[in-house]
Amino acid sequence: MSEIATVARPYAKAAFDFAVENQAVDKWQVMLAFTAEVARNEQVTELLSGSLASEKLADIFIDLCGDQIDEHAQNLIRVMAENDRLSTLPEVLSQFIQLRAVLESTVDVEVTSAIELTKQQLANISAAMEKRLSRKVKLNCKIDKSVIAGMIIRAGDLVIDGSVRGRLERLTDVLQS
């Protein structure tokens, strides 16, 4: 996974820098999302792992995308095909989104709880995380019954585990040591 991230990083950075410079970040995110979906397609995946010449592969990929991508995105596709990197498009999209979040000073916060949280609880979590991280947050909520009670909050490298499951695991570790 980290190898794919390393390979995708320069393409994501180049696309992001170009998008910012041309005030087209939304447009580029849509184009990259479309190309990532094309790259994820099972038949396209087989095509990418085949032995087609890079120029032919780029032409086929661009034809599949049709008018969903502009000439600049087509150039990115050609360069990525030339370097045998089209399969990394989903990771390029992921890193592009991360770069955009940094630019907009937002951070994705994943909240996992056993039950659905109320709007007031979500507002309280959002306010507390914005204060702690000194950035705007975007909450993504998941329900996972294995949490038992409480919640787990993830924001980048920060993990706050206030779940009963987490407490039981920590207690088990203490008792076993």
Swiss-Prot record:
Subunit and interaction comment: F-type ATPases have 2 components, F(1) - the catalytic core - and F(0) - the membrane proton channel. F(1) has five subunits: alpha(3), beta(3), gamma(1), delta(1), epsilon(1). F(0) has three main subunits: a(1), b(2) and c(10-14). The alpha and beta chains form an alternating ring which encloses part of the gamma chain. F(1) is attached to F(0) by a central stalk formed by the gamma and epsilon chains, while a peripheral stalk is formed by the delta and b chains.
Protein name, entry field? ATP synthase subunit delta
State the similarity comment: Belongs to the ATPase delta chain family.
UniProt keyword annotation of Iron present: no
This entry's Gene Ontology molecular function terms read: proton-transporting ATP synthase activity, rotational mechanism
Q: Does the keyword Transmembrane helix apply?
A: no
Q: Which Pfam families match?
A: OSCP (PF00213)
User: Which coarse location class describes where this protein primarily resides?
Assistant: membrane
Q: What is its subcellular localisation? A: Cell inner membrane
Query: How does the UniProt record describe the way this protein sits in the membrane?
Result: Peripheral membrane protein
Which domain of life does the UniProt lineage start with? Bacteria
Q: Which GO terms describe its cellular component?
A: plasma membrane; proton-transporting ATP synthase complex
Protein keywords: ATP synthesis, Cell inner membrane, Cell membrane, CF(1), Hydrogen ion transport, Ion transport, Membrane, Transport
**Functional summary from the UniProt entry:** F(1)F(0) ATP synthase produces ATP from ADP in the presence of a proton or sodium gradient. F-type ATPases consist of two structural domains, F(1) containing the extramembraneous catalytic core and F(0) containing the membrane proton channel, linked together by a central stalk and a peripheral stalk. During catalysis, ATP synthesis in the catalytic domain of F(1) is coupled via a rotary mechanism of the central stalk subunits to proton translocation. This protein is part of the stalk that links CF(0) to CF(1). It either transmits conformational changes from CF(0) to CF(1) or is implicated in proton conduction.
InterPro entries, per this entry?
A: ATP_synth_OSCP/delta_N_sf, ATPase_OSCP/d_CS, ATPase_OSCP/dsu
